[in-house]
Amino acid sequence: MIYISHLVLDDEMKALVNEYGTGIESIDFSISDNLDQLSDSIKTYWQKMKEIGTRDLILHGPFLDVNPCAYDSLVREATMTRFNQCYEAGLQLGAKKIVFHSGMNPYVYYKEYWAEHVAKFWKKFIKNKTEHYLEMDAGWEK
């Protein structure tokens, strides 16, 4: 299945899905305002998918203002909360996969420390999560 980022108007997305038989990759659940209103956001996106005419969905996890390898424990806690909210949205919407960013920035973190540090976050995050295929996306990694 090929997925197209839902970065266009819904009518344009519907035309693309209908013409090419694609699924949708949505960033809606990477946006904090949508996560703050999670139930309403899920209902709204469910309706969008219905109108667009597909149930094939990939979610892109939060990536702004969050960081799974942050030194600051409160930032990691906020990241965990946002990632869990996105995961819940994925469950309810039947997403095939959720894409998350690793948080690696070579200008801030040493690779050796980063790998050990971020592994702790991801082990905690994936504990008891078996319903989705989770993917880590490279942002700054080389």
Name the predicted role of every residue range:
Residues M1-Q85, L91:
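N-terminal pre-domain/capping segments
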Residues C69-K142:
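Active-site acidic/histidine proton-transfer and metal-coordination neighborhood
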